């Protein structure tokens, strides 16, 4: 298994375990999603924790495609309103996740 896939899976596993602080995010981590772009690990975690508590009931990995430094992870996000198909493009450097671009329909999610 590629290191990028291991880190992409750690991303999903950290949220499922309710331990986002344990996810190996770089200090200068950048996350882009339908809600916008957030830069900085702590700023991202402070912003996303309450959103995840309201909107995410489960995450189930369907498939990954990986190279040395990037991984696409397709997963289902369980929400109070049903299941949302998601794909995250995860970039890594030096054993940390440096960026994620998330693709999903946010129509039924609350900010």
Which residues are covered by each model-predicted region?
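C-terminal and inter-domain tail/linker signature
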Residues: 1-111
């Amino acid at each position: 298994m590629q290191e990028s896939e291991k880190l992409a899976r750690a991303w999903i596993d950290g949220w499922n375990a309710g331990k986002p602080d344990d996810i190996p995010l770089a200090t200068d981590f950048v996350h882009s999603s339908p809600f916008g772009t957030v830069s900085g690990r702590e700023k991202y975690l402070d912003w996303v924790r309450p959103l995840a508590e309201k909107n995410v009931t489960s995450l189930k990995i369907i498939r990954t495609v990986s190279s040395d430094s990037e991984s696409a992870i397709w997963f289902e996000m369980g929400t109070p309103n049903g299941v949302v198909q998601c794909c995250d493009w995860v970039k890594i450097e030096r054993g940390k996740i440096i960026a994620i671009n998330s693709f999903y329909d946010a129509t039924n999610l609350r900010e």
